[in-house]
Amino acid sequence: KRGIRLASDMVPNHTGIDGNWVYEHPEYFISQDYSPFPSYTYNGPDLSTNPDWEVKLEDHYYDRTDAAVTFRMRNRHTGEIRYVFHGNDGTTMPWNDTAQLDYLNPVTREAVIQKILHVARNFPIIRFDAAMTLAKRHIERLWYPKPGTGGDIAGRAEHSMDEREFNKRIPEEFWR
């Protein structure tokens, strides 16, 4: 009627550390049940709004002495602990308010595709922030580095994967 159109700004690389998917679909995220660095501590404020989970940033975030690569989630009922990696493009510090999606998981890829399609049905224009990190070469470089390379994200070298295995797990560029 007035010629106004809305655009959506979507970040398909990661979610917020307190996003619904973090609680409802923990398998969508790059996480592990131990801290990537034994010296990391998580004694700061609980940032969770979910009554079932506690979410804490690594303490060095607050005193600015290190760039924490994970945050800790603790289930208040079972005591289960997960260390979830923050989003990162490998060029600067981790994005400490984010949780990194695991694109090696085909269920995650499909969930993101469906979310993109949902947004596309509601907005004529979509801006994708951090979209370059969805390319296979960046997923490999950042999160599943080749053996012996160390990778661009601290704490991920032990998750290295040879090219053949990586290509088997992500056979094609899923986002095209």
Segments (PLM) and residue ranges:
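Aromatic-lined substrate-binding rim segments of carbohydrate-active enzymes
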Residues: 1-6, 144
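Hydrophobic faces of well-ordered beta-strands that scaffold small-molecule active sites
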Residues: 6-8, 126
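Short "lid" loop at the C-terminus of a central beta-strand within the Rossmann-like core
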Residues: 12-14
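Alpha-amylase-like alpha-glycosidases and glucanotransferases acting on alpha-linked glucans and related
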Residues: 16-176
